[in-house]
Regions:
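Conserved nucleotide-cofactor-binding alpha/beta core module
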Residues: 1-103, 111
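SAM/dcSAM-binding transferase cores
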Residues: 96-188
Length: 188
């Protein structure tokens, strides 16, 4: 993920929201930007800045995860680390090549017991999340966006199942689905 003044501001704002007893981890792929962020945010005891690829970073556990770079797919580690009622905000984007800004939609996922509620919030154009992009997922996401109806997404399914007409985007580790409610008993 690429850091900017916006990312630094977002981390600082989140740190204020969680307060002095909370903990915020900022992740930056670029060594110099991570060092600068660490320096600029040193006054916030509850902030930790890591220099690593956010696309491959798996937090231990989290109430909230905010990805500020476009991905073609969700990572199992991000979903696995969400505590109950935890939220994940992620721009799902398609791009003409892996290093250009992608266009897509901001996805909100909420972990609710055994299920994940999901819906798109708004269109977005943003820089790429290097470790969470691949061409196959890019094409699958592009095809789903061409079909439209992104507003019909209501849940994220993690159980293995065959693609069906309720799958807006069917992937290897997740499916963005138009199904609502308790989906744990949905037949394949």
């Amino acid at each position: 993920m690429r850091s900017s003044a916006y990312v630094l501001l977002a981390v600082a704002i989140i740190a204020e929201v969680v307060g002095p007893t909370g903990h915020v981890i900022g992740v930056e792929i670029d060594h110099d930007l991570a060092s600068r962020a660490r320096h600029n945010l040193a006054y916030l005891d509850q902030v930790e800045v890591l220099q690593t690829d956010g696309g491959n970073y798996n937090p231990q556990s989290a109430d909230a995860i905010f990805i500020n770079a476009g991905a073609t797919h969700l990572r199992a580690g991000w979903l696995d680390s969400l505590l109950d009622n935890g939220r994940l905000l992620l721009p799902l984007t398609v791009a003409t090549d892996p290093n250009t800004h992608g266009m897509g939609f901001m996805l909100k996922v909420r972990h609710e017991g055994q299920r994940y509620a999901a819906h798109f919030l708004s269109p977005v154009m943003i820089c790429p999340c290097i470790g969470s992009r691949d061409e196959e997922s890019n094409q699958r996401l592009r095809d789903a966006m061409k079909r439209g109806a992104w507003g019909s997404v209501q849940s994220l399914r993690r159980e293995s199942h065959e693609p069906s007409d309720t799958c807006w985007l069917h992937g290897d580790i997740f499916c963005l689905s138009t199904l609502a409610g308790d989906i744990s008993s949905v037949p394949d």
